[in-house]
Structures are given as structure tokens and as C-alpha cells.
Amino acid sequence: MNTVIAFILIFGTLVFFHELGHLILAQRAGILCREFAIGFGPKIFSFKKNETVYTIRLLPIGGFVRMAGEDPEMIEVKPGYTVGLLFDSENKVEKIIINQKEKYPDALVIEVEQADLEHQMRITGYEHGNEDHLSSFSVSETSFFIVDGEEVQIAPYNRQFHSKTVWQRIKAIAAGPIMNFILAYVILVMLGLMQGVPSDEPVLGKLIDNGRAAEAGLQEGDRIQTINGENMRSWTDIVNTVREHPEKELKIVLMRDNVKLTKYVTPEAVKAGDETVGRFGAYNPVKTGVLTSISYGATETATVAQSIVTNLGKLVTGQFSIDMLAGPVGIYDMTDQVAKTGVINLLKLAAFLSINLGIVNLLPIPALDGGRLLFLFIEAIRGKPINREKEAFVVFIGVAFLMLLMLVVTWNDIQRLFL
């Protein structure tokens, strides 16, 4: 599979489901979601469904759901502004025309005296030609601004993010990472159904034709008891022992059809990174079945998550170097290497990256979902929200930190791969 396509498909899928989690829970809470975006930068494709514009942007390195009220509204109607009003069948303001009013001859033009488009949903002003009479108009809950011919939905306060309960906001933010864990689980269950679930029993699975194990007379189903006199209690024991003995003869005692046999195998020496290890051309056995696959999906998701959390802890304590982190360039190279081995391994990589994305997003760093959740938990404990300006300042610092970290990691990737 072409590496670029594989990278875009994997990364795009992970981002899509992450942002979909945010979108679904936000919409359930009644929050107006203005945009659901995959990628950053200029739009290359977009369409609108119901209240939300769905876009694909040029740089496939993330995504976002733009919820009303998270940022200051871009369009304001202040006293002294001249706007045009269009009405619905209930005589409520349906559209407020900000500019190019000449294109809407049916609009009632007023000079605004007062406008409350969040709580009271009313706009008051003087009609052109009747400046002595102040008129007040009720504004529909589903009204729009029209700016440069484009409609922008007005967000009453009850449709804004900060109007919702702390619990509703926590669910909307946490849903993104949770969706990544669910996606990884589903992928792993699919892999279990497609190829079986790897077993850690000390039993041989399929053998590679002309591999060292096959040449030595070993067969699928052989239960390994000892290697060089050491008891083999699991497949992991077998792998570790074989890895440690490249091109060194091993005495293997096994059971086959209730008969004890002794075989001699010399593992092939192969390069694995900077070291040489032994392999003997045998796979571990697999178990099949729906329940087995469901269980495997859960345990493997938990195992991978635990491993990632452990490594993050080592990063904090200095046991794990920042040079070992991979950014977009490193992930692209990883995708290139894995793509050469087939679709199954690409799916495994996608599951790993999905879990990784979920965990990283839960880190309590401002600008990440975890940082936003931290603010919400503090609000729940205090009983009142954190000052918006202070929160914005902390988020700015978080964004700067993440940008710096991304630059460092990307530079490390480039040095490691190309220099």
C-alpha cells in the first residue's frame, strides 16, 4: 500500500473518530457545533448538514470541533450599527444582514439601539425613514447573521458550551479520547476474528517453510517442555531463549501425540535494530472464536495503554529520553515500514496509535483535552468556573509548550532518519 495513502487513512481515521466523540456528546448536550474539521489549514472540501459545516483541511495532522461559546463570537451587533432584518412566518427576526444590504430589498433596515442575542433574544432600533419611533423585535432561537452573503448561525446562550452543566461539558471533552479507546478495541477484536488470538502457551503454531524449526523436524502443535534443560512455561519463554542463541544449537524436548521427543535446532541470526538475535521460523499458536476475540480486544487495549502510561512516567522521571519520542515524521516512517508487511500489521499500528492518541490527549496539559478536563474538575470542586482570561492565558502557554515540543520531536525525527 502506498505509504502516503496509508498514513492519511490511518491518521485521518484516528482524528475522525476522536472528533466524532466530541461532536456526538456536544450535540446531545444541545451545544451548537459550528464546524467539524479533519486537518488544519485551508479548506479543500466542505459541506453543511443541519447546523454543522463538515470540512477537510489541507494538513492531515489533527482536527477540531468548533463549539459555540468556546471562543468569543466573531460577529457582534453594537449600538449605532445599521443592519437589515428578515422575518419568519411568526414575525420573528430570522436573519440579520450585516453588510451588502442592497442585495436584500425586502429587508427592514434599522439603526441598532440595543441588541441582546444571547439571553433575551431581542434587537431594538430605529427604522430608516422613521427615526422618531423606536421598534423592538423578537429574534428567533435559530436565526442567522448574513455576512458577505454567507449565513452564520446565531448562538443563544443556552446553545453555548459554557451554558451547560459541568458534567455535560466533561462528557463532551472526554468523549474524544474515549472514542479512541473504543476504536482501538474494535480494531483488535476485528484482528482476533480475522487471524485468531495469539496464545502464550509453549506450543508451536504455524511453521515457516524451509525455516530452521521445520528443517529440524518440528511440527505445528508440538508442546515445548525444555530448551537446553530450562523449563518453557510460555511462548514468551521460548521466544526469549531463541533470541538469545543466534546460530547456536539448542536441545529441545517436546511432546507430540503424548510421545516425548528430542530435537536439535540452530536459530538463524537476524538483525533487529542494533543487535543480532535468533529466530527459528515458528509462530505462536492462535485461538479462534467470538468470545475469545472480544476478550482479547479488551486485554490487549489495557496492556498497550499500561505500557504507554509506563513509558510516559519514565519520560517524566528521566528514564526515557525525549529523543525516543516520534512526531509526524517518525510516525510516517513507522507507517512506511509497517505498510511493507501487510494490512494486518497496519491495523495493529492503527490500534496502537489510537490508544496512544487517547492517552496523550488525557494528559493534564492546557490546550489538550486533559487540560480542559482539569479546569472543569477544578470548577466542579470550587463551585464556580475559573476566570476566562486566566484560563485563556494558561491555554496559550500550553499551546506554546506543545508547539515547542512538536518542533523538537520533529527535528529529532529528521536527524534520526535523514541526517
From Swiss-Prot:
- Amino acids binding Zn(2+): H18, H22
User: What InterPro entries does the database record attribute to this sequence?
Assistant: PDZ, PDZ_6, PDZ_sf, Pept_M50_Zn, Peptidase_M50
Key word Zinc present: yes
Give the E.C. number(s): 3.4.24.-
CDD domains xrefs? cpPDZ_EcRseP-like, S2P-M50_PDZ_RseP-like
Protein name, UniProt field? Zinc metalloprotease RasP
Which residues catalyse the reaction? E19
For activity, the cofactor(s) needed are: Zn(2+)
Regarding protein family, the annotation reads:
Belongs to the peptidase M50B family.
Question: Which coarse location class applies to the principal site listed for this UniProt protein?
Answer: membrane
Cellular compartments annotated: Cell membrane
GO BP of this protein? proteolysis
Disulfide pairs here are none
- The question of whether Transmembrane is a record keyword is answered with yes
Assigned GO CC terms: plasma membrane
- Which NCBIfam families would you find in this protein's record? RIP metalloprotease RseP
